[in-house]
Amino acid sequence: MSSNYALPDVFRAMAVLTGALAKAYSVLPNDSSKTSNASDVAEASLDVARAFEEASQILKTAVSSPVVARALSETQNNGTLHDQLNSSVQNIAKASTEFSAMGDIFKYQAKAQVSLAQIKACSNAQCSPETVESNFQEAIRDYEAASSIALQYGFQSLAEQLSDAVNQLKTALSNYEKTVATLQQIKQAQASGNYWQVLNLALSLASNQQNTQSSKNIAQAANNLKSALNAPLNSNNMSQYYSNVVSAIQSFPRCTQVSTLVTTTSAVIAIQRLLQLGSSELQKAQQATQALLQSAEQMWSSAYNHAEKAYEAFSLAEQLASQFVSQELANEIEKGLEKVKQFVAEAQANMNANKNILADAFNTVVDNISNAVNDLMNWVNDLIETHIPGIVGQILAGVVDGLIFVVISLIPGVGQIIDGIIAFSFISNLVEQGIIAVKTGYGAQFLQQLEESFLQPQNIAMIATSVIGGIGLERVLADRLPDIRIGAIDAAKEKIGDLMSDFKEKISIGLHGISDDASKVLDDIKTKIKGNAVSLRDVGSTIVEKKIEVKAPDITKIDVKPEEITAKNVNVKLVKPLSTDLAKQLSEKFKSVKNLKDLKAIVKVDKEFRIPYDLQGKSMGDKTVLTADYMEGEVLGLIKNYEADVKISPTSFEKTIKGAELKPPELHAKLSSFDYTGKGILDVEQDIIDAIKTSKDISLTSDGKGVAITTDKATTIVPVKKYFDAIMTGYAKGDFSDVKVAELLSKVNSSDLARLMTDDIIKKLKDYKGSGELKIGDLVIAKEIKGDKTLYSVAKIGPDGKPQSINVVSDIDDPMFRATVYNNLLDMVKNKTEFDYLVTNLNKMKSLSPDLQTTLDRLTVKPGERSISIEGSGGKYLNVTEKSLPGGSEIRAETNLEGVKAVDALEKELDGERQATLEQLLESYKNGGFRDVKALADALGKIDKLPDTLKEALAKYFDRKMENSSLEEEVDLIKGLPKMYEDLKTKVIDPVDTFLNKLKAKGAPESEIDALRQLFYKRVLNEINAGRSLDTIDLASAFVKANEVLDKVDDVVKDLKDRGLPDNLVNDIKASMFKQIEKDVLSGKPLDINRIEFDVLRQKEDAIFNFVLDKFGFDKNLLKNLTPDQLDRFKTNVVDQFLLKHITDKNDLMDEYNNIVKGPSKVQNTTQPSATQNTTTQPTAQNTSLPGATQNTTLPTPSKVQNTTQPSTTPNTTLSTPSTTPNTTTQPTVQNTSLPGAVQNITPKDLQSIVKDPKVLDEINATVEKLKDLGLPDKLVDDIKASIFKKIENDALSGKPIDINNIWTNILMQKEDAIFNFVLDKFGFDKNLLKNLTPEQLAKFKTDVVTDFMTNRIVDKTDLMQTYMDVKATVKGPGTTQNTTTPSVAQNITLKDLQSIVKDPKVLEQVDATIKRLKDLGLPDKLVDDIKASMLEQIKKDALSGKPIDINNIWTNILMQKEDAIFDFVLDKFGFDKDLLKNLTPEQLAKFKTDVVTDFMTNRIVDKTDLMQTYMDAKTLVKGPSTTQNTTQPSTTPNMTPPKIEFKDQNVKPPGTGAGTDVNTPGSGSQTVTSGSGLQLLVKPKEIAAQEEKIKLKDLQSILPEETLERFEKLPDSLKEKVIDEIETRLRGKKVDEIEGIVNDVIDKYEKLYDSAVKDGMLNDLKNLIDAYSKKDNNATEVLTDVGKSLEVLKDLNKSVGTSVVEEAKYNSTLQTYLAGLGIKDLNNVSDKQLIKIGTDVTNTLSEKFGTPVVVLTPEEAKILVKELNDTLNDTGLNTKFKIEEVKPLPKTLEVILATLGIKNETKQRILLKELQKKLPKIRITDLIVISSKGTITPITWDDIMPTYYTNVQGQTLPIYTTQTTTTHHITPPPPPPPPPPPPPPKTQTITTTTQITPPSPPPTPPPPPPPPKSPKMPASLSPSSGNAPSEAEAEQAEQVLLI
């Protein structure tokens, strides 16, 4: 059927199919410790199905192709050939149909594998029987369908095997159900201690075999076992009983799934009987010792006999336990043996003593042993109970794995090539793993046996269900494949080679024939495996004992002939020690060539090269001999790159194709025609040596049996053996050097020779590894590479620069041969995409015709040109053109392949030794030696596609393992990358996907999925960073954390829904929480769900507040009665109390309102005696004392926390106005007025909702009770309690760990003065005595009094006076404590003296431990000695006074005393800039000092970064009195600039002329920002009620590098303010070491935004939209028309906005999540429709954000919008080109818009409104603006109204309108044009405003300067006055009239 060579598509189909089949085999397990992944098998099955379908289509197309028609036509005159070809066509058509059917079969198989995967999953989980049964039934149905198709198309054998699989599944299901029931009975029997029942049930499981013979064998073994166990046992036959039991246990088959259970249970039964017998014998010995009228000697003799029997029984039981159960059990029995030995020794020693002593000793032994026996039985019960439950799952896993193996083995299409490998791999693995080998004994450990038996369940299940019968030793292949071309076989061999790679390190392959004995043994094995699965044990025994040789195919020895595919065989020695040699060789070779960059680039060419041929032919009968003259230029040398023994042999031309198989004399005669002289065959070694020495070329003859030695005079052919002998002889004589020998051997390279030279080759590779980098890609091979046979020669460039002659012989006259060659050449080239494939196949065709050019020339039908073109990936191409020339042809090749070089002679690149080395490398590559490179490349490709987090994790893991590795270890690591990837996939990717898919199936949104995925991947990266190994990573805890996250979010959502919040708001809160979760995970923050909930609820405060007011019908007009500060607190309190369910109706809401209204005035009257004299309104809340901001705050915002952390620090600090003198020393009133109020609002219930840990409140309550017991006043107790609550709340909300002891210490230090004064007053201490103390003594006395009082050491005035005297006596002088007093004290207190007083040695040990800790912290010796002396002095004092010694309390006291010294040391140690302390208030400094000392002592400050973080925390969280008491609306702190609000109102006096003075602005009132970097303030100036502390430039200069500051300065001025604004927001709550990254990120963002938005032209589109609204009149039709036009303009605007959002989203993960919510994931492919959708959503959101409750858009409100919109432009940086010039002062409701357009009639407005709402649902704020590119802002004035401004939580500055109120405003004029005169100082202006609002007409544009615009009246219909506006009923009536 050679005619198939004319059908290239057939071969292509075979290649596709063969590759898919080989890939399917790759999912098989390569050793018995691994199992196939069912999902991989399903995927492979789908691949095969697709391959069959593709092959079917290819074949269907092929039979109708022009090639087939031409072949049938041309062979009409040749009947035989025509019939053969026609038959082939029919067969291919039939194959097309059958392949389609096979595709369906494999589809069903894939479905079945999915069901099997579910069953396998049940082996690791607790699945219900119904689930398992359902999956079994699904698999059965799919296999039945596949079997039906196979039967329909005549695949009889395949149908039978599929039917067998169905039966096996049914049997497996039945066995599963029986096994579950039986195991339940086993557990019950075991629980009751009935081991006989356990054994019987286990034996019933073992005998449940399908195979009759197997069942009989097990049944017989079971009977033998039970007989041996139940045999009579007495003191005389113990040894025989033991021997019989051991023999029966060892004879029981080990191949069943319960064999270990049978073995263990049998041993336990026997042990139990032996222990009971031993106990009985001991009792008899005991009775003997109690017998009367016996001497001690008689007692001893009788007792000894019984004890000896007992010892024997215990000893046999111990041996059974050690051999079959557990070494632990054996050890316990050994203890009994020791007790018997002890008894014997005691008995012998007391033989002549009183017999009662003997009896007592015996009783003790017997009792102990009896108890031990009972304990042992209980222990065995527990052990078995632990391991029984897993058997069901393990059996299920085994059944499924067995079926996977069977089903894969059914894949047809590869034939004996796969058969042999599968047989070999299965048998060799079973032997290698010891599964079927005879074992002399079993493990001593019960757990090891159980693991060995059940952790390889595939072996159990395959045997138990007779699955072994289908392992593929008998292949089902109805029709053998037709001829397969070389390419297909190459593909098959490459894939099959992958299967062999795992075995190469276990076996040694020799090139020897297989013996008949080995063949027979293999046949026997096949028979046994097919017939009796249980006898595998015997099979393994035969293999191991006889060391016989089992045949397996050598992958390089394959013959391909028309009708068959056969494989030559080599012996495989299954002797494990032989495996190490080859494994070592392969490892060394791989290591030596790991620098080869591109193993495929063997031949490279210039971008254009030419192959000129000038050939002349000489006729020699039926042969053609060709020569090539010398020529100038370079010649392409083709590489022999094919398997040496592969022959393409069409039967009719077999002799020709094999080449000129001429005998040596005949070949000699042919060669003589080339002017060579032949001397015949040489027999003399010296002649051969001489010929070699003078040779020009040496090559192997075509038959591989001779060597052709070419000299100047002749070519001599000698046998290979003589050639080798001559080389060895010449080497011995010194004629040849080592290098020359290597070169000569390489000339005739063969597999045998390669193996002999392995060590030498390896050595050379190592040498060249060090001497120079060896890169095949840099070497252009112009020389033939020798193989086992030389079938051709090529021209090469000689030493003289000219090519040597070409000597070739071939027969190409036969027409059919010419057609075959030409068709194959084109077919192999035209469909391929790689250049090296062309080279490979051209070489293969040259093996058919030694001169390719002559072949092409002879085959040319028409003169002229023809070409072959190949297009590869990435635009690469290769064109080969043939042009006929006189006397020959020219081949011209053009390519654009990169990195190619001109052809160079090999001799110029390498010396002889390197040539040999390179040839060996290429030979290894050809034989698959570097196949691991492909697997490595595939793995790297997969790794590159991993998410960044996982990629980073894997890279760090790999880098860590590479550190300090040897070269060989590094090679193994690189080779292990595929395994690392699979571990990552198995351990991380697959489990995470499974978990998330379950969530997705439950309807979880994408935001949840993305956040959780990042959580898991971040967890993996953290574990890798922590040093964990991939194979130990366990995501179980991460899944638990994820569930906690989901549960918490669900709880929040449920609570919000329970409170009645609308769904859209609840969903918005939920989405915001997940966005924050994702952000925290990505940034590496610890996940604090409580903090996230708190932050999100604060963000949504306004929406929730409005909802509550509407829900309970609150009159919003009441809000006008509140000051901005009161409104802010009311809003916060309402939201908090509503969520905590404290507000449930309108009454509760009104109570909250009344509390706010009444509360602040009281505070004002107590803490601010002098109010501002220039204001007429009531003082606002922000003028009150500090605690006023927190009295009603349960869950405060961060800004509020900062203002309320420390209400008071020292008794010398008061909260007063600026006029208060600093000499005031009275006690503060804050403690008595404000903090109790805070306690009332921070309830334990509220705090518990934040803290979650119930122990915290218990500890607080205990502390408070202790304070009350000490008699402290209630107010002081409440003050302390409030401070503790506030500190806990702050720590919980900021994510810090809550340390009650630390908090208590800090609060105690803060309240020291108050407690001190209380104690002095309580015990009547004369405070005049304090004048006698130095400042140092007073400080120590104060600390000691408070500490001793709190620890009950001061209980009366005597104790107090003693403390006073001690302090006065011990603390001397004005200097610091550590420098003057305690060192001298320490000199007088020796440890010995102190120990004699203290008595307790642990006290001094604790002191030593404390001192050691101080030294470890690096404190100076002098300070440490000072602290030690102080501690010893206090200990001495306490000991002498009889007080209990409390080291912790003493340590706390000393720490407080030495706080200043330690604080200074820490600052100096870390290089802290002490100038920064000037920025702190006294309260902040006190907290900073305490925190520094505490955190340094507890290792929380370890570097400067930690110290700076503590500084920032103290600066942020603690506010001094001056930060609030001096603040009045709307003034600002000296470092802040108020908003520039400009008025063109003639009634407003210019700055500097008003009489009023801002209470916060002493002097001129001018407040400006100094020039320089905008980072000086880091915040945009805003006018807010409670100023927040800002990070100043000076703070940042120690953090930010110069490069960052320079980048900021280079920004456009218009962008700087926005950058600063965002930096402020993002720096809140951040650590110091995060600041630099955040600042750089913000600068990056705005640089990119600027470039993006300029290109978008967004402002032009926006302008078009505005222009559309400039032509409105009274005509409603025109209005509607304009609205329609505006909609089109609006689309353009929205598209532009959408484009900007998409561009920013490319580097903004938050926007990516937002767009994903809109269904847009591919940011590089967004349609116009999607862009419009994005823009619409964004502008809608912005419109909602800009909305305010004010009805009329006033000029001031217009200014706010100008500012907000210009800020929006700042976001994109477009403010340098465009600014919002004007915001039209139009009303914002649609009705008023219509009125402004000229439609005055209210009913008409309603009608038009309905029409507008249909077409344009929302009029946006942007619809009302006018844009100018002049860069100016034209403010609009309105004379009659002036709002009061306030700043809400979000930082928005909004107006509030009050009736007849006068407000003082701070006015800053705009800067005049350059050159600017000095600006006049700003002054205040009193303005009276009313609610009578009259909108103006649009201002005219007269020439400058413009007159003040007039103020037209508002239409009556729109006036807010209720007297002028028509009622709703009147409007409705008017509308009805108009409609009628």
From Swiss-Prot:
TPR repeat positions: 119-153, 155-186, 480-513, 617-652, 1691-1724
Biased segments, Pro residues type: 1868-1883, 1895-1912
InterPro entries: Formin_homology_domain
Comp. bias (Polar residues): 1186-1200
Stretches with biased composition (Low complexity): 1164-1185, 1201-1235, 1521-1539, 1561-1571, 1884-1894
Signal peptide extent: none
Presence of keyword Repeat: yes
Span list, region Disordered: 1160-1239, 1519-1571, 1862-1940
Name of the molecule in the record: Protein ORF1940
Organism: Acidianus two-tailed virus (ATV)
